[in-house]
From Swiss-Prot:
Subcellular location, record wording: Virion
Any Gene Ontology CC annotation: viral capsid
Keyword annotations: Capsid protein, Virion
Domain of life, per lineage: Viruses
Chain's role: Assembles to form an icosahedral capsid.
Name listed for the protein in its UniProt record: Major capsid protein
Organism annotation: Staphylococcus phage 44AHJD
């Protein structure tokens, strides 16, 4: 039902924007439309309507907010300005010490400022998508202006959907990678079966609701500054990342009943996928040396790839590149090794910011091929905060990266 509702919401949003754009155009020009009598559509009514009225009007809407493929979309915060770096501050806990009256009284005058821990996240990124509409297509291949307009709208919506799918894959990979490499060993619990996993998930949910310093990664922030930071998570803020098969199992357990009694829809608090892999991370730097690799990358939208380009360590690809010659042995799939995987975390630990206002840029007309190219600029920032609770339950061996490696 939710998916059907989303589709209806998307259609309604686009329809309202298209209607508003048409009203504005008719007010400025006339209600009598033609394709024009030139060999191309440049400066004709159709070209003017699509590029000067329709697309800018849709660009003003929150079409990107309608979940066209991104299950993490509800977490995104729209901000007019996203700094390249974002820093989070917390005040460290102070442990009370009993007063020793035999000590020098001057000790009472010594100042003790609260300690502050910080975590500096990585930089955000600008995603670029482009699509090209051929004027001859709209002139010769469509019977009516309505058909041509629907075609233009369809291409635009598809590109936004592509961005959302890319964002979802990156967010999922980031969560999986964090759970396997960043958690403290004490926050990784072993399970031997579905039943055992469900029992440990229930216990973990109870643990996260206690005021404790055990379940965060503060000791890894600020270059390993020593300190204690207690955190507590409300039931409404706890989510689980897992597989579809485990979600279907968890929905039939006492965990779901616990959420239901609290008036919370448990299905909204389990983010699941049929496969938690599909994203690849570069483990060793190399150069692109084969035209087949260039053609493959360009087919997936990386049109700027060239022979001789260096692929750095840590680069992420949201599609399978492991079979390409240069990539073989130099990439690893970000994926749990076992199907028994449940990552329980406080939803506030996910930092997801973006800026989509005005993302559709003015078009560029190429008179040689009589085509118009549109660019979409999408600003995105994603990070995981160490200052909130997290517990991983799996049956695989997890070895968190050493402190020194994390600080490099």
């Amino acid at each position: 039902m939710a998916q059907q509702s989303t589709k209806n919401e998307t259609a309604l949003l686009v329809a309202k924007s298209a209607k508003s754009a048409l009203q504005d155009f008719n007010h400025d020009y006339s209600k009598s439309w033609t394709f024009g009598d030139k060999w191309d559509n440049s400066n004709t009514m159709f070209e003017t309507f699509v590029n000067k009225y329709l697309f800018p009007k849709i660009n003003e809407t929150l079409l990107i907010d309608i979940a066209l493929g991104n299950r993490f979309n509800w977490l995104a915060k729209e901000q007019d300005f996203i700094g390249q770096y974002s820093e989070e501050y917390v005040i460290m806990d102070t442990v009370p010490i009993n007063m020793d009256l035999s000590k020098n009284e001057e000790l009472m005058l010594k100042r003790n400022y609260p300690r502050m821990a910080t975590k500096l996240y990585g930089n955000g990124i600008v995603k670029k998508q482009k699509f090209t509409l051929n004027n001859n297509d709209t002139r010769f291949n469509f019977q009516t202006l309505a058909d041509a307009t629907n075609y233009a709208l369809g291409v635009y919506k598809k590109k936004i959907s592509d961005i959302n799918v890319l964002e979802e894959k990156e967010m999922r990979a980031m969560l999986v990678d964090y759970s396997l490499n960043q958690l403290s060993e004490t926050n990784v619990r072993k399970a031997t079966s579905k039943e055992d996993l469900a029992s440990k998930v229930f216990e973990a949910i109870l643990n996260l609701q206690n005021n404790s310093a055990k379940y965060n990664e503060v000791h890894r922030a600020s270059g390993g500054a020593i300190g204690q930071y207690t955190t507590v998570s409300k039931l409404k803020d706890i989510v689980i990342l897992t597989t579809d098969s485990l979600k279907s199992y968890l929905l039939d357990t006492k965990i779901a009943n616990t959420f239901q009694i609290a008036g919370i829809d448990f299905t909204d608090h389990v983010i699941s996928f049929d496969d938690l892999g599909g994203v690849f991370k570069v483990t060793k730097e190399f150069k692109l040396q084969n035209q087949d690799s260039i053609d493959f990358l360009r087919a997936y939208g990386d049109y700027q790839s060239q022979l001789g380009d260096t692929i750095p360590v840590g680069a992420v690809f949201t599609y399978d590149v492991s079979k390409l010659k240069e990539f073989t042995g130099n990439v690893e799939e970000i994926k749990p090794k076992s199907d028994l995987y449940a990552f329980i975390l406080d939803i506030n630990s996910i930092k997801y910011k973006r800026y989509t206002k005005g993302m559709l840029k003015p078009p560029f007309h190429n008179p040689e091929f009589d085509e118009v190219t549109h660019w979409i600029h999408y600003y995105s920032f994603k990070a995981i905060s160490p200052f909130f609770n997290k517990i991983l339950i799996t049956d695989q061996d997890v070895n968190p990266k050493p402190e020194e490696e994390l600080q490099e």
